[in-house]
């Protein structure tokens, strides 16, 4: 028979060490497989005052020049783009404009060499400086503006404008506490918060001074 059936021809070719034409065509395509990128992210601090910058650093593996998108999500949203160095590292400085809690992530942008990926979220709290005092002695047993009774172990703060129940994170010399707004005040110029005795003790606050506040 002059012509072999396709299946027979393929079997014959394999028996003498040749690859079928279809197999040769498929293997001849030089498809480039993308590798999976890995992005690491580090913040120089996890607490910063509004208006002051922090360093944001990271690395993309495999090394090379890659595009990275940094996203800051919190009271507002900020996006910054950066190109890595040849060794895959990147760095920039970011200055927050509002107080509150942020989650920061780095996204490795998908390109012809790597598939996109994202880093673990890094937490950041931004603060402002706030004048503070404390109250309690002589007032225990009295009601507070947001409901309840002021006692020596009451954890909370008084503020003139924040809604009752608003959670505020305060820092003083490395100590921190998160407490609700429970009362109104202080009605003294230059002061934003009145701390209860229990909050004062928790922070090691002297009585009158400046604290870092997340609101």
What do these predicted ranges mean?
Residues 63-73:
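Short, ordered, surface-exposed loop/turn motifs in non-cytosolic proteins
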Residues 2-12, 16-51, 55-59, 64, ...:
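Secreted/periplasmic proteins
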């Amino acid at each position: 028979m002059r012509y072999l059936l396709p299946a027979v021809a393929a079997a014959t070719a394999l028996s003498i060490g040749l690859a079928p034409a279809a197999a040769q065509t498929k293997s001849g395509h030089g498809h480039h497989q993308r590798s999976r990128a890995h992005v690491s992210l580090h913040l120089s601090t996890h607490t910063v005052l509004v208006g002051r910058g922090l360093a944001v650093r990271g690395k993309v593996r495999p090394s090379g020049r890659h595009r990275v998108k940094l996203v800051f999500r919190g009271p507002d949203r900020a996006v910054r783009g950066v190109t890595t160095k040849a060794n895959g590292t990147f760095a920039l400085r970011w200055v927050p404009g509002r107080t509150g809690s942020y989650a920061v992530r780095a996204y490795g942008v998908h390109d012809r060499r790597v598939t996109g990926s994202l880093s673990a979220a890094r937490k950041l709290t931004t603060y402002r400086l706030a004048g503070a005092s404390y109250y309690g002695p002589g007032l225990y047993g009295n009601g507070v503006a947001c409901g309840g009774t002021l006692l020596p172990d009451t954890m909370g703060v008084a503020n003139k404008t924040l809604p009752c129940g608003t959670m505020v994170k305060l820092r003083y010399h490395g100590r921190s506490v998160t407490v609700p707004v429970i009362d109104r005040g202080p009605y003294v110029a230059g002061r934003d918060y009145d701390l209860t005795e229990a909050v004062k003790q928790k922070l090691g606050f002297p009585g009158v001074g400046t604290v870092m506040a997340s609101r």
